[in-house]
Structure formats: C-alpha cells, structure tokens
C-alpha cells in the first residue's frame, strides 16, 4: 500500500452550493497530501468526498442540506425508458447526423429531461465546489516521508536471520496438528482434471441451450445500446481514458480547459476561471496511481474520460477508479450538444466502465455518484439510476433507496436511515484504539499516539485527534499519518 498523509482542519462553515444560504453549510475538512486508493475507498464509505487535495465530510445533523453518499450497483443496473430514449437519440445522431431540436412528444415515462429543462447536467455526480479553508496546511516533504517509510518496511539483517532460523511448518509435528484442527480436510476425493474439463464443457452447453431459449425475449443491455459503431455512421464518437498526470492529459489540456470554461460560463453563469484554477479543481489529486497485479489495467487513481466527436472534444468525465468503485467527481460538456443529454449519457458510459472493469476485478462493481440531497429537488435526479443505495450517516451501512426512505426524508431532511436501533458502525473508533493512531511529527518522524504521549506527557490537542479518528474510522486512523 502507498502511504496516506493528511492534515485535519476541524469544523468548517461556508456558503451552501445547493440552497445558496450564507455560512450554513457545516462540514469537517482535511488536506490530503497523498492518499492510498484503499484508504480513500474507506473514507468515501464513511461519507467523505474530495475536491482536489481537499477532503470534506458534511455535518449532516446540523448542516442546511444533509448530503447522503449514493451509489449504484453497476452489475445489476436497469435501464429506464428515459435512458433508452437518450441512447437511441444519440445513436440516431451518430448514424444520420441529424439534430433533434427537442424530445419527441409522449416518448417519456414521467422523467424530466433536465438537459432540455434547465440545460444542466442531469444525471451526473457533479457537486458545487466546496469553499476551501483560508489557512494552509503545514508544508512537508511527502517524497522524503514516503522514502523513510519504505526504508522502515525493509527487513533488517537480524530480522532476516531470525526468519531463516525459524522452523518451517513441516519441521514441527504439533504445528501440523494445530493446522489440521483449524482447517479440517475434506473426505471427498479430488476430481481428476479430465473429469473437471468434462464438467465445464457440459455446463457451457447447458448455458448456451438456456440462452437460446431466452434470447428471443431478452432485453437489450446497456452494452448493446453503446456498441453501435459502424463505418457508415456520419459521426464517430471515441472515448479516451487518461490519467491526470499523463502526457496525453498535458497535450489535450488546451481543449479540455476551453471546454470547461465554455461550460461554466454557459451552464452555470460562473465567471471564467484561469487554467491554474481548473487544474487545482479537476487535475490535482492526492490519489496514487497504483497498479497492483490483480487490479485494472490502467491501475487505480484519478482519470479524465474524454468524449471525442470526430476530432472535437465535446465532454469530459472526471473520475476516480478505486478498489470498489468508479467514483464520479465532475462532468462537463459542450453546451452546443445539450440536445444529446450528455449529462445522462456520461453516467451511462461510466456505469458501462464499471461493468467492464468488474470483469477483471469483481469487487469493482459500484458507481458512486457523490451526494444525494433530498432537500434540494434539483439534486434528486441521482436516485433515478437503479438500483441505488444510500449510506446511513450513523452506521455506515448501505440501504436501498426506496419510496419508504424517500417518504422519511420528506418528513425530515436528516434521517439515520438504518431503522435497527441496535445496529452499530463496525469500523467505529473507540477510546481503546487511541494509542494506535498514526502520527507524523515535524514533517518527518512517524510514531503512534501511545509513544507520542510517553514522549510529550500531556497532549493539548487530544480532543482534535479523537474527533479526527472518529470521523475517519479506526482502520484509517491506524493506517493514515496524521500531521502534527
């Protein structure tokens, strides 16, 4: 694992990007110098979210607009009539080159096409950019800390010698006996390889037979709708997935920044930002580009998925690829192509990416859409992707987004969600875990809270460290380095 290093800011108060209220958005914030992708997966499963290097978690019981982390199971995803309508519209445009000025009357299923209603991203995971704290985090040499950590992990000569001298499992009869007791050996005879091959062949024949009877009535899948490229098409749509620090990102930066600026001005009426602000918002990332042998080909980390229509960049999806999900960070597109409902199309493409990645990494089967804000009607669109799940803000368990939960949120904007009063957070940080919290002192010395307290005696910021540890959970508190 890579090293995660964070500096906790504490409680924050700012203008709300959803209801536009002044100083009513309440959150906890921290700066992430760098994050292991597994640690960030654990953090977003506790309600955290990142914007560049800044990570924040809403104080849902107090804030004006409670935010619930939402995800969709990509492998069980069901296309709605509205989804199919949009996919057919795009396929017709690619095939014939004809623009439809508006959706056909009566072709909907009760779902509004927000791209036509307010020309805004309608099924994307984009959130308003959080207001960053005024204070700057302590300056540390991340590379130096990481190299020291690597050196500390290398075995010493004494440790190596001890390992050589240690008896093997086979040299100790009692250890073999205890091993057998722990894992009972099955009495069933092992199948021969030839028999196993025959069983697999029969299973395949059975699958193909059952498929042939179902194929006539089987509905088209998301992949069926997306795989319609043809040499006779008037337009060609190509997707490119590039890491945010690749040469290809730098080469296409002028096009992506120009597109972002056009989107911000036209869609959100925001003043144009300079290129540095764009990079700080949508390129900067604390996530390390990790490429484990059992991970996806491109590895984990932060990426831009670019949509090229012929030779023109028309949309960009900013995503994090993590061990358990594709997390959508932001999506922007060319307003000239709003008739294609690119906001929804981008989400469908990102779900298809989840389905593709899950073929190699089965655990990577979820699509995270950021926050579901029920008290803000324009942000309820995220719940239309099915099946969707909301994160309980107290037990951190996932619960299906049902009409029952929607009704509860209609009654009161903050809800525990998990109705079992006995349910607890399995990753809850308790005072007995305090000694194990990892610290980084003076930008270079790694220790834990127990040794730090022995060294310093009374610790003045106990409460802050405890608050941080409760928010990130006991596992991340044990792994991540808290900068002091």
UniProtKB/Swiss-Prot annotation:
Keywords: Acyltransferase, Transferase, Ubl conjugation pathway. It is an enzyme of class 2 (transferase). One of its GO terms (cellular component) is cytoplasm. One of its GO terms (biological process) is ubiquitin-dependent protein catabolic process via the N-end rule pathway. The keyword NAD does not apply. One of its GO terms (molecular function) is arginyl-tRNA--protein transferase activity. The keyword Transferase applies. Its EC number is 2.3.2.8. InterPro entries: Acyl_CoA_acyltransferase, Arg-tRNA-P_Trfase_1_euk, N-end_Aminoacyl_Trfase, N-end_Aminoacyl_Trfase_C, N-end_Aminoacyl_Trfase_N. It catalyses: an N-terminal L-alpha-aminoacyl-[protein] + L-arginyl-tRNA(Arg) = an N-terminal L-arginyl-L-aminoacyl-[protein] + tRNA(Arg) + H(+). Belongs to the R-transferase family. Involved in the post-translational conjugation of arginine to the N-terminal aspartate or glutamate of a protein. This arginylation is required for degradation of the protein via the ubiquitin pathway. Does not arginylate cysteine residues. This is Arginyl-tRNA--protein transferase 1. The gene is Ate1.
């Amino acid at each position: 694992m890579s090293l995660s290093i964070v500096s906790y800011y504490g409680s924050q108060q700012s203008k709300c990007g959803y209801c536009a209220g002044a100083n009513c958005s309440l959150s906890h914030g921290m700066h992430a110098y760098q994050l292991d992708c597994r640690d960030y997966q654990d953090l977003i499963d506790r309600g955290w979210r990142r914007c560049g290097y800044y990570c924040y978690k809403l104080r849902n019981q107090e804030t004006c607009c409670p935010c619930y982390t939402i995800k969709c199971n990509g492998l069980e995803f069901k296309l709605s009539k509205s989804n199919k309508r949009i996919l057919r519209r795009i396929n017709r445009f690619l095939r014939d080159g004809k623009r439809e000025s508006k959706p056909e009357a009566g072709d909907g299923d009760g779902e509004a096409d927000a791209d036509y209603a307010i020309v805004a991203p309608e099924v994307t995971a984009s959130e308003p950019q959080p207001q960053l704290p005024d204070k700057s985090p302590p300056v540390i040499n991340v590379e130096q800390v990481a190299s020291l950590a690597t050196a500390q992990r290398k075995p010493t000569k004494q440790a190596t010698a001890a390992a050589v001298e240690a008896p093997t499992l086979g040299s100790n009869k009692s250890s073999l006996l205890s091993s057998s007791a722990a894992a009972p050996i099955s009495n069933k005879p092992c199948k021969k390889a030839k028999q196993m091959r025959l069983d697999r062949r029969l299973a395949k024949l059975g699958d193909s037979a059952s498929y042939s009877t179902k194929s006539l009535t089987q509905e088209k899948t998301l992949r069926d709708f997306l795989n319609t490229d043809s040499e006779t098409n008037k337009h060609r749509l190509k997707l490119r997935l590039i890491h945010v620090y690749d040469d290809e990102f730098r080469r296409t930066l002028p096009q992506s920044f120009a597109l972002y600026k056009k989107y911000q001005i036209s869609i959100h009426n925001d003043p144009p930002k300079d290129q540095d602000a764009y990079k700080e918002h949508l390129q900067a990332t604390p996530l390390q580009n990790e490429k484990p042998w059992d991970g996806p080909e491109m590895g984990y980390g932060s990426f831009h998925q670019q949509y090229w229509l012929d030779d023109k960049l028309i949309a960009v999806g900013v995503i994090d690829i993590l061990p358990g999900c594709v997390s959508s960070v932001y999506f922007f597109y060319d307003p000239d192509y709003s008739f294609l409902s690119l906001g929804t199309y981008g989400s469908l493409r990102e779900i298809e990416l989840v389905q593709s990645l899950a073929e190699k990494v089965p655990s990577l089967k979820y699509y995270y859409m950021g926050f579901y804000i029920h008290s803000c009607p324009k942000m309820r669109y995220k719940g239309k992707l099915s099946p969707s799940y909301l994160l309980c803000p107290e037990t951190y368990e996932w619960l299906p987004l049902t009409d029952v939960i929607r009704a509860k949120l209609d009654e009161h904007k903050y809800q525990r969600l998990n109705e079992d009063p006995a349910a607890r957070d399995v990753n809850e940080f308790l005072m007995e875990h305090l000694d194990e919290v990892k610290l980084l002192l003076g930008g270079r010395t790694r220790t834990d809270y127990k040794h730090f307290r022995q060294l310093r005696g009374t610790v003045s910021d106990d409460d802050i460290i405890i608050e941080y540890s409760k928010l990130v959970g006991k596992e991340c508190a044990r792994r991540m380095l808290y900068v002091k």
